[in-house]
Amino acid sequence: KNVVDAYIKGLKVAYENNHNLFIEMDAGLSHDPRAIPMFLRVLNEGNECAFGSRFINGGSLAESPLNRVFISKFGTLLSKILLGSKLSDMTSGFQGFHRSIVYKIINHKFRSTGHFYQTELRYLLKKYRFAEVPIHYKAPSPSVSVKSINNSISTLLWLFFQKVVGGYRGPFGVVSV
């Protein structure tokens, strides 16, 4: 139905095949697969989540149009302000998880129906052990649809409202400040 359903379906198939570590990345080589060993190392060092970041030392946005860079940086800034995130990149789609986290992901009904799913997920996982991994990203397209932007804004505001009224409750536990 939507991009989130595709992510969840892929994670569910991998989960049902009894994998213990999971890497999620964009198709089409917009994410550099040479970063995968760093994700695995971070996950094997006791972190439950590994989040790719284009904005930490060693990361980059290669050949990305200015509007994509702006959207990524602005989305991260807004998430930091409204949701209290400490991550340097809230909009990257390159991430890794332990099996226990994937169980929670596949049993959660995400509010987002688009790529803001990554931001929603990072907010929900903020109390778990995580580390950021520097990644290189090459944007495949300069365009971002109005529908995607509207979904992102409405989901961000909904998460902020949940935070203000006492926290989100679900398979990730209570998520608030």
Feature names for model-found ranges:
Residues L21-F22, L40, G46, E120, ...:
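Short, intrinsically disordered, charge-balanced linker/junction segments flanking boundaries
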Residues N20, E48, R129:
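Residue-level detector of anion-binding/catalytic polar loops
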Residues V13, N17, L124-K127:
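Active-site catalytic microenvironments for nucleophilic, acid-base chemistry
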Residues E24, G52, V133:
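Short beta-strand and adjacent tight-turn residues that come in two discontinuous sequence segments
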Residues K1-E16, P33-H115, P140-T155:
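Acceptor/aglycone-binding surface of glycosyltransferases and processive sugar-polymer synthases
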Residues H19-S30:
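Short beta-strand-to-loop acidic/aromatic patch adjacent to the donor-nucleotide binding site
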Residues G84, N107-V177:
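Hydrophobic helical membrane-anchoring modules
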Residues L29, M38, Q118-E120:
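An aromatic- and histidine-rich active-site surface loop
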